[in-house]
């Protein structure tokens, strides 16, 4: 049985004070759920968030990292630095990183390898644009991303990787893939993992859906056979909405 995982991606939102208030508001309910809860905070809030979480079951996530250990990379942060702060999960390949910062599948692959080396658990984001979807290229795009992003990743490492299917056309737009459509693509991702590795790995890897997930549609999405969780954007910024998803 795959344990559901709900991750909130705050993007460039929340001050340290707002982060601490949010943690205080959700901690009790998030502690009693059987769902794994992850908060992907801005870099500036990670240290204080970790202190506030303490021995909580809620996991801490970061939103980006560089693939080098150190060096002349102004504005970047390394996996080792994140690990030192107590980070558990790391978003890699989010569509906004790919779109606005020219992140490629090759750099995504480097980041995954470095994250695993530092015992961070990657949440690998993949998904197609509206144009690619309308051109019936969704499966081709996903296959290319999975093939390159996981190049050289050993079978034993797959237990530490979460995959998030986030159709780019559904992020921040209010549009959502139907639960059936999302499950169809996620089942295909699971098939790709089976072909690359084996049945055991494909049946244990957790695959989330991301794209305008909110309390109103969380139950329907989570009831699909192959969907193991959600990567939540806007709805993760409000405690009541986020808890509504966590308690689907």
Curated annotation (Swiss-Prot):
Subunit structure, interactors included: Homodimer.
A GO CC term attached to the entry: cytosol
Function: Involved in the gluconeogenesis. Catalyzes stereospecifically the conversion of dihydroxyacetone phosphate (DHAP) to D-glyceraldehyde-3-phosphate (G3P).
GO biological process: gluconeogenesis; glyceraldehyde-3-phosphate biosynthetic process; glycerol catabolic process; glycolytic process
InterPro entries per UniProt: Aldolase_TIM (IPR013785), TIM_sf (IPR035990), TrioseP_Isoase_bac/euk (IPR022896), Triosephosphate_isomerase (IPR000652), Triosephosphate_isomerase_AS (IPR020861)
Enzyme class: isomerase
Alphabetized UniProt keyword annotations: Cytoplasm, Gluconeogenesis, Glycolysis, Isomerase
Pathway: Carbohydrate biosynthesis; gluconeogenesis; Carbohydrate degradation; glycolysis; D-glyceraldehyde 3-phosphate from glycerone phosphate: step 1/1
Gene Ontology molecular function, alphabetical: triose-phosphate isomerase activity
Subcellular localization: Cytoplasm
PROSITE patterns: TIM_1, TIM_2
Family recorded in the similarity comment: Belongs to the triosephosphate isomerase family.
The name this protein goes by in its record: Triosephosphate isomerase
Catalyzed reactions: D-glyceraldehyde 3-phosphate = dihydroxyacetone phosphate
Active site feature: 94 (electrophile), 166 (proton acceptor)
EC number: 5.3.1.1
Binding sites annotated in the UniProt record for substrate: 9-11, 172, 212, 233-234
